[in-house]
UniProtKB/Swiss-Prot annotation:
Gene3D superfamilies: Single helix bin. One of its GO terms (cellular component) is photosystem I. The chain crosses the membrane at residues 7-27. This is Photosystem I reaction center subunit IX. Keywords: Chloroplast, Membrane, Photosynthesis, Photosystem I, Plastid, Thylakoid, Transmembrane, Transmembrane helix. The lineage of its organism: Eukaryota, Viridiplantae, Streptophyta, Embryophyta, Tracheophyta. It is a single-pass membrane protein. May help in the organization of the PsaE and PsaF subunits. GO terms for biological process: photosynthesis. Its main location: plastid. SUPFAM superfamilies: Subunit IX of photosystem I reaction centre, PsaJ (SSF81544). It is found in: Plastid, Chloroplast thylakoid membrane. It comes from Lotus japonicus. Coiled coil: none annotated.
Amino acid sequence: MRDLKTYLSVAPVVSTLWFAALAGLLIEINRLFPDALIFPFFSF
């Protein structure tokens, strides 16, 4: 039971850190390369 409580307390922290890092990475990519989803399709 102690292991289950440890798991339930660690998983939200790890997922929060992961999603925060992913959001920051996506924000920085969009800052450095704005409209990256549009340019490759209309550059030909």
